[in-house]
Amino acid sequence: MDELTLSIGGSPGKLAGTQLLYKQKIDKEIRLSPTDLLFSSNTVDHKLRNKRTTIALLSREVQARLGKWMISFADQKGTAADFGLQLAKWVQASTQLHYYVHPADMSALRAADQSLIRQLPRVTVEVCKTKKVSQTDPIEHKYQSRPGMIEGGVTITPRQAVTLEEIYPLASRPEKGVIMFMLSQAHLEHLIHPVIKQVSNYFTCVKVGTSGFSLNYNHPYIRAMFLEPITACDVVELPLQALHARFSAGKGHLYLCGDGHAPRTLTCAQMFDIPHVHDFTMPSVTVVSFYAPEQHIAIARYASWYEKDTICRLLQSTLPDVEKLVWLCAMSYPIFPSLRPTLTGSIFSRCKVVVSVSAERSRLLSDGLPKWAEWVDNVLSDRIAKPACLILIGPKASSKSFVTRQLVAKLNASSLSVEGDNFGRVDSDAFGKWVTMMVSNSTLPTSWAQFDLMQNDKEIASYVDIRFNDICVKHGFCELDDLRTKNAGVLQGEFARSFIEIIKDPSCGLRAFFSWLFSLYGLPRGLMLESHTNVEIAEYPPTTCILQLLPNYDVMSVLLERDARKGISKLAEMQMEEYYNGLRIGTYRSVLACELLRVAEVGPPVEG
């Protein structure tokens, strides 16, 4: 059983606000290997360690009734601090228990229930008015018998004992103890009932997830109880053969979550009877459609949670077209023709733009927003050591810097502190610029304010960019046309060697950079650390708050259109992103820019 199902019951259907979907019919038993038994530190039963074991599963209905029984029992006991251990003993009954019943309570039961009470396995029943105890007994053992008592001092009525037996017969309970599977997800904590949390501390607890990361859908218990969600983002880049293999292997264990799935994905899902659960998360959204003016053919369509008036003011403002497009993409998500449309700054001049309000289904789902909100709350409440770090992974040209700048400015403006800024950001290119200054013996910043100026200085080239550009030149890749006439694969091996050499350098690597950074005067309490890849974060400061930013447009087209950066050509930058893309794995929780900006109440710089 698990904490969540005990707390909320297991009604079939998607749990609101999450991607959790119970199976209609769960497996009757699961087989656990030693690697599946990641025990919590509060585990009291060690008999299962290093052993392969088969356990029976409780259905959703049984877990719901059992959880309700625990909660009602605790409600009758008030705020007693000691009922958790004794209640867990009674529910598990993995060792011999002594149960003392008052004669009047026993006689009030039906004959069948009296017989049931007396025949409970692993329970010794004694009918008596009082329980004599010696002075050496612990204080909890001196609790009087009426309305009934089990060893350890917690009272339970015969009717409660009968009800529990009807829900979960003692004969069916494992002699080695009941396992409590811990989902350990921060965004689910508010759903776990306090009584279940207290009682679960005294069960054999096995973790099936880690806060800051997703559930382990390969774990036998999760695989038996829940369907694994497949969002449009998860399969958008899979070739058809790989998609077919994924659905074939996961038949009976997967479901399509939300909308925005490509027709081939829907067709493939139907072939393997994989259910599709729509997600109506917003009653209405503002839809921005781009049409070719002559044919009136839709080129792209985005939906935004911002009000129509806000979007119209943005589009009618005097901001440059490129800046308008950046804001629009950061405030919305794509709904046509794909999850990553190809957009350029000229789209406003060559297309007709139509803004409307529509009842629209959410096209993209992310599970990282609660983790970001939790991190912000921790920084403001000073519950974690300074600096509290959040890592944001995303491709080049995915608006990481734009989003973090807006968030930091808004958060600092709304949480003034006499000690300085509460929040700060470290650009994904800041490390490369620092290395450039190190190798050129330039004067390094001595305060956070000076560092912030340095990382935003476009005249300082990143050492990583310079090295990658030199590799391209060395192999004769100087013009974009060279990508059609030469084999770009020769660049990847040298990219890899240089990249690892740079980030792991003992004196100028990432660890040395962060050691220097954390010594600066005026360091904010919370830092958003940007990263291009999963590989880099192994050298970052430790944190459990790691998110992946989902780009909602084709980043390659943006790299091709935007101005070349100092120290690197467009060709080299595009090849660098090709290399980085292979080092990003969808391990961590994802988040959309529009979700972050909306929650932080960030709006475009236009007059209302």
Curated annotation (Swiss-Prot):
Task: Report the subcellular localization.
Answer: Virion; Host cytoplasm, Host cytoskeleton
Spell out the GO cellular component terms annotated for this protein, sorted alphabetically and separated by semicolons: host cell cytoplasm; host cytoskeleton; viral outer capsid
Domain of life (superkingdom): Viruses
> Hey, what's the signal peptide range on this chain?
none
Swiss-Prot/TrEMBL keywords: Capsid protein, Host cytoplasm, Host cytoskeleton, Outer capsid protein, Virion
Question: What does it do?
Answer: Minor inner capsid component. Displays NTPase and RNA 5'-triphosphatase (RTPase) activities. May function as a cofactor of polymerase. Associates with microtubules and plays a role in the formation, structural organization and morphology of viral inclusions, where the assembly of cores and the replication of viral RNA occur.
Annotated protein name in UniProt? Microtubule-associated protein VP7
Query: What is the organism field in this record?
Result: Rice ragged stunt virus (isolate Thailand) (RRSV)
